[in-house]
UniProtKB/Swiss-Prot annotation:
Residues 170-240 are annotated as: Disordered. It comes from Xenopus tropicalis. The keyword Transmembrane applies. Residues 1-248 are cytoplasmic. Interacts with SGO1. It is a single-pass type II membrane protein. This is Leucine-rich repeat-containing protein 59. Pfam families: LRR_1, LRR_8. Required for nuclear import of FGF1.
């Protein structure tokens, strides 16, 4: 703090009335904080230094009326330079300025401007003129202010155009978002409906299966199965075994009788009767037939067909 106060005091020593001369001071930056403490210095000379730029807070020195920045290496002015609303005289001779900030149009008090020996853009250089005398510098201030107002208008129109484009883009995005949300709602609704239909089908199928199961169960209860037949008693089992044996014996006897009859028929009515076996069979047949002649019915039935 003491050091800052010391610098401020040094600056005050250079103050002559309302003029503060800091030219040829080998400055590479503007001591803005020290200058703020000297609002009386409405005329500030910073010419012939090593300044390459002005800090943004330099624009807070709105009380400055006359500013000399000639013969430095300043490439551009702060974007808020237009806040120096009391500035009437501005010397920018021999710097490296190419263009002026848009806010320059707000310097409505500016009456005198020198932009000689700067690599200005052609349009700005044409408006600035030569600035060879007092009259031309005043004309320069007037022409440049008019030009910068036009630039400001173009800038504002471009800004409005960009804002409108951003607004339109935002509206399009919002519209697309609404469409997407509506599509998502429809999709969810359709999926929910499909899920509901699937659940209904599953429920109906389950009901049908349960109904069929109940019908089968009821039918099984009404028609006793093989497992529910009454268990036979020992007496019934014995009778069943006896009947089974009798059926087997009857089958064997019937089979034997059929074989015997077939043998008799074969030996009686085929060429086999000449064989020894058939002669024996025929002899037995004749003996049996003779023994049964006493029965008229059997005699007629067993009568030798050859004798008929």
């Amino acid at each position: 703090m003491a050091r800052a106060n010391g610098r401020s005091q040094n600056l005050r020593d250079k103050l002559d009335g309302n003029e503060l001369d800091l030219s040829l001071s080998d400055l590479s930056e503007v001591p803005v904080r020290d200058l703020v403490a000297i609002p009386k210095a409405t005329a500030l000379d910073l010419s012939c230094n090593k300044l390459t730029s002005l800090p943004d807070d330099f624009c807070n020195l709105s009380y400055i009326v006359r500013l000399d920045l000639s013969k430095n290496q300043i490439a551009q002015l702060p974007s808020e330079f237009g806040r120096l609303v009391n500035l009437q005289h501005l010397d920018l001779l021999q710097n490296r300025i190419v263009a002026l900030p848009v806010s320059f149009a707000q310097l409505k008090s500016l009456k005198w401007l020198d932009l000689k020996d700067n690599p200005l853009k052609p349009a700005l250089a044409k408006v600035a003129g030569d600035c060879l005398d007092e009259k031309q510098c005043k004309e320069c201030a007037q022409g440049v202010l008019q030009y910068m107002k036009s630039v400001q208008s173009d800038h504002e129109r471009e800004l409005q155009r960009k804002l409108q484009l951003d607004k339109d883009r935002k509206q399009r995005l919002e519209a697309q978002q609404r469409v997407k949300e509506e599509q998502d709602r429809e999709l969810r609704k359709r999926m929910k409906q499909q899920q509901k239909e699937r659940k209904r089908r599953d429920y109906n199928a389950m009901q049908e299966a349960q109904k069929a199961l109940n019908n089968n169960k009821k039918k099984a209860e009404e028609e006793p199965s093989e497992n529910h037949k009454p268990v036979p008693t020992p007496k019934e089992k014995k009778l069943a075994r006896r009947q089974s044996r009798l059926r087997k014996i009857a089958c064997i006897l019937l089979f034997g009788l059929m074989v015997a009859l077939l043998g008799v028929v074969a030996c009686r009515f085929t060429d086999l009767k000449t064989f020894e076996v058939c002669r024996s069979v025929n002899a037995v047949y004749k003996e049996t037939l003779s023994a049964l002649h006493s029965n008229p019915v059997l005699e007629r039935f067993l009568q030798d067909p050859s004798s008929q």
